[in-house]
Curated annotation (Swiss-Prot):
The cytochrome bc1 complex contains 11 subunits: 3 respiratory subunits (MT-CYB, CYC1 and UQCRFS1), 2 core proteins (UQCRC1 and UQCRC2) and 6 low-molecular weight proteins (UQCRH/QCR6, UQCRB/QCR7, UQCRQ/QCR8, UQCR10/QCR9, UQCR11/QCR10 and a cleavage product of UQCRFS1). This cytochrome bc1 complex then forms a dimer. GO terms for biological process: mitochondrial electron transport, ubiquinol to cytochrome c. Binds 2 heme b groups non-covalently. The chain crosses the membrane at residues 33-53, 77-98, 113-133, 178-198, 226-246, 288-308, 320-340, 347-367. It is a multi-pass membrane protein. Heme 1 (or BL or b562) is low-potential and absorbs at about 562 nm, and heme 2 (or BH or b566) is high-potential and absorbs at about 566 nm. This is Cytochrome b. PANTHER family: CYTOCHROME B (PTHR19271:SF16). Belongs to the cytochrome b family.
Length: 379
């Protein structure tokens, strides 16, 4: 068996990636979220495939096909809710995974980090298009509002929006192409995940101390495979409780009303995992400025390795940077809350303040604090 594992062309790759992989001996539970993201992606692809067997991407039947899945298909309701809440679990793990990368300085592995940013954008695009498919009120108006942002691009904006829509408004052509892209993107994400892992295994994993762990490695299996299994149990338990006891907790009641272009919902908002970016978009009164801020709220991650001024890689021994990191986390939670509130005072001013603080923290405060810590340590 050992010989097959180490000599067979395919088994050899799996062995070097998941069994005999040398891993740092001190990585904490924050490193569990990578494997949990792999599990989430698998769950989403499997449940999505079964949903696609019964879903019809036509404006006249999309809403009723989702109702048909829930009422008439064997266990259709649970497949639908695992898929919907699985997306929430996916983003929850994704945000923690990125946060861990920021805290422990994993962004210094440039190739891995940049592929990770591409993965984030691809997953966000997939989730957005998936939200449009049930063709409820929030699906229709969310698609209209977000795609309409492209019209802010000078010269080509209007033509670009109509090209994305496939007409002069969000309609049948839009729904059909969104379904096609929503189906293919998870497989592109899976391919990017493989590239992400290839780059990670080129350099080896980071660890909480941020220093080289070449002198102290242990095999991935059984140590970290068992450790990851604990995370899997927690994730599946949380997802099961959410699906079986409160499946609509994170959804919007407006999406149980069929899409109607003549009636605008009182408050258009995306799913909770986009609310921080939506709050940044709304905080700027100018349309083009808002779109640029929205794009930068994600793309700013690509600048972080170049803004890293500290002599130490990890924040483990940098208390001032730790404080700033948790200020950033609190700020993102504030933005998420604001994104779900109506556009009125005091929410407008809170959103604007939090948006300024978000960019200020990443672009100015964190690099300056790192330089100050270098001075304190006489480096």
């Amino acid at each position: 068996m050992t010989n097959i594992r180490k000599n067979h062309p395919l088994m050899k790759i799996i062995n070097h990636s998941f069994i005999d992989l040398p891993a740092p001996s001190n990585i904490s539970s924050w490193w569990n979220f990578g494997s949990l993201l792999g599990l989430c992606l698998t769950i989403q692809i499997v449940t999505g495939l079964f949903l696609a067997m019964h879903y019809t991407s036509d404006t006249s039947t999309a809403f009723s096909s989702v109702a048909h899945i829930c009422r008439d298909v064997n266990y259709g309701w649970i497949i639908r809710y695992i898929h919907a809440n699985g997306a929430s679990m996916f983003f929850f793990c994704l945000f923690i995974h990125i946060g861990r990368g920021l805290y422990y300085g994993s962004f210094t592995l440039l190739d891995t980090w940049n592929i990770g940013i591409m993965l984030l954008i691809a997953v966000m695009a997939t989730a957005f298009m998936g939200y449009v498919l049930p063709w409820g009120q929030m699906s229709f108006w969310g698609a209209t509002v977000i795609t309409n942002l492209l019209s802010a691009i000078p010269y080509i904006g209007t033509n670009l929006v109509e090209w994305v829509w496939g007409g002069f408004s969000v309609d049948k052509a839009t729904l059909t192409r969104f379904f096609a892209f929503h189906f293919i993107l998870p497989f592109i994400v899976a391919a990017l995940v493989v590239i992400h892992l290839i780059f990670l295994h080129e350099t080896g994993s980071n660890n909480p101390s941020g220093i080289s762990s070449d002198s102290d490695k242990i095999p991935f299996h059984p140590y970290y495979s068992l450790k990851d299994l604990l995370g899997v149990v927690f994730l599946l338990a949380t997802l099961s409780i959410l699906v079986l006891f409160s499946p609509d907790l994170l959804g919007d009641p407006d999406n149980y009303t069929p899409a109607n272009p003549l009636v605008t919902p009182p408050h258009i908002k995306p799913e909770w995992y986009f609310l921080f970016a939506y709050a940044i978009l709304r905080s700027i009164p100018n349309k083009l400025g808002g779109v640029l801020a929205l794009a930068m709220s994600i793309l700013i991650l690509a600048l972080i390795p170049h803004l890293h001024t500290a002599k130490q890689r990890s924040m483990m021994f940098r208390p001032l940077s730790q404080c700033l990191f948790w200020v950033l986390v609190a700020n993102l939670l504030t933005l998420t809350w604001i994104g779900g509130q109506p556009v009125e005072n005091p929410f407008i001013i809170i959103g604007q303040t939090a948006s300024i603080l978000y960019f200020l923290t990443i672009l100015i405060l964190m690099p300056l604090t790192s330089l100050f810590e270098n001075k304190l340590l006489k480096w």
